[in-house]
Design a protein with these regions (language model features):
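A structural signal for small-residue-enriched, beta-sheet-centric alpha/beta enzyme cores
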Residues: 3-157
Length: 157
């Protein structure tokens, strides 16, 4: 999510962003969180740190993963941050994982989350995911190659 149109110099300003998420499996809570961002939190290092983009990917596994699988998934997710701007963190949930992005690039956030989704599907023995059609087409090149798309790669399509 991008807070404001930064290319136009816009940010949340005097506004307030509130979000609440609760995920339950049976009688057990897997995730419960609330987020409220106002002007002060936009610039605080424990808030947005002056960055306009935030995102969260939560995966609740259908069955508990073997510790080796979870370790491989988390280490791979950390390696997938290579070459991307922003602050990215990934950790284990019982069972599953949570990944968060905070930075200046919605493209970097989408790419990292797509890389993670590809790893999650591989762990489950599922096919390679398709690149979402609503995302800019040049990002499909980035999903397979961490190098930035160039004019040559986007016009060759």
């Amino acid at each position: 999510m991008r807070l404001g149109r930064t290319a136009r110099g816009e940010d949340l300003g005097a506004g307030r962003f509130c979000n609440s998420l609760s995920i339950r499996r049976g009688e057990q809570w897997a995730v419960v969180e609330r987020l409220s961002l106002e002007q002060e939190q936009l610039h605080h290092p424990h808030g947005m740190g002056g960055e306009p983009v935030l995102g969260t990917l939560i995966w609740i596994a259908p069955e508990p993963l073997a510790s080796e699988q979870l370790t491989e998934l988390l280490e791979g997710g950390r390696a997938d941050r290579e070459g991307l701007s922003g602050t990215m963190a990934i950790g284990a949930l019982e069972p599953g994982l949570i990944a968060r992005y905070r930075g200046g690039s919605s493209q970097a956030a989408r790419l990292w989350f797509f890389r993670l989704w590809r790893r999650i599907r591989a762990v489950q023995g599922l096919s390679e995911p398709s690149w979402p059609r609503t995302w800019p087409f040049q990002e499909a090149d980035l999903a397979l190659n961490p190098e930035p798309a160039t004019a040559a790669t986007t016009t060759a399509r």
